[in-house]
Amino acid sequence: MSELTTIARPYAKAAFDFAIEQSAVEKWTEMLGFAAAVAEDETVKAYLSSSLSAQKLADTVISICGEQLDQYGQNLIRLMAENKRLSAIPAVFEEFKHHVEEHQAIAEVEVTSAQPLNATQIEKIAAAMEKRLARKVKLNCNVDNALIAGVIIRTEDFVIDGSSRGQLTRLANELQL
């Protein structure tokens, strides 16, 4: 776990709890997503690492975000600036999204395949994973030619390696025993 994730966790939890309380999860997702995009800009990153006052840094981020931040979003930016944590805004957004997915019972599943998957294959994998996990899934599909053939499916809890590379590795391990 990275240091930024550790720093971001309490801010994300507080923002999520407040968003739930205010029935504004979608609004907060948009606000934090926009603020994270701003904070990830190279020029803004350099500015945030300067030795300017917290007030000046917060005012700058708030003015760049403009109307994308409501007063509560602005308060979060000010609080993070006072604590010298503005560089953690993208990590706060990522942690916030994890809270939202958990709240909505959505599991993130990473699917790595040797070749690009077609829509039918993606639907079948999604249906199988939803059945196995008993919750909705969000698939993130990647291509890795080194797999030779097949797929590797990763969730937070387990990995299913159905790739040719994985089968060859297991076979090699068996032969060495």
From Swiss-Prot:
SUPFAM superfamilies: N-terminal domain of the delta subunit of the F1F0-ATP synthase
PROSITE patterns for the chain: ATPASE_DELTA
Gene3D superfamilies registered for this protein in UniProt: N-terminal domain of the delta subunit of the F1F0-ATP synthase
Membrane protein topology class: Peripheral membrane protein
GO terms under cellular component: plasma membrane; proton-transporting ATP synthase complex
GO molecular function, one term: proton-transporting ATP synthase activity, rotational mechanism
Keyword Ribonucleoprotein: no
Main location: membrane
NCBIfam families hit by this protein: ATP_synt_delta (TIGR01145), PRK05758.2-2 (NF004402), PRK05758.2-5 (NF004404)
Described purpose of this protein according to its UniProt entry: F(1)F(0) ATP synthase produces ATP from ADP in the presence of a proton or sodium gradient. F-type ATPases consist of two structural domains, F(1) containing the extramembraneous catalytic core and F(0) containing the membrane proton channel, linked together by a central stalk and a peripheral stalk. During catalysis, ATP synthesis in the catalytic domain of F(1) is coupled via a rotary mechanism of the central stalk subunits to proton translocation. This protein is part of the stalk that links CF(0) to CF(1). It either transmits conformational changes from CF(0) to CF(1) or is implicated in proton conduction.
Family from the record: Belongs to the ATPase delta chain family.
Subunit organization: F-type ATPases have 2 components, F(1) - the catalytic core - and F(0) - the membrane proton channel. F(1) has five subunits: alpha(3), beta(3), gamma(1), delta(1), epsilon(1). F(0) has three main subunits: a(1), b(2) and c(10-14). The alpha and beta chains form an alternating ring which encloses part of the gamma chain. F(1) is attached to F(0) by a central stalk formed by the gamma and epsilon chains, while a peripheral stalk is formed by the delta and b chains.
PANTHER family: ATP SYNTHASE DELTA CHAIN (PTHR11910)
Protein name, UniProt field: ATP synthase subunit delta
Lineage: Bacteria, Pseudomonadati, Pseudomonadota, Gammaproteobacteria, Pasteurellales
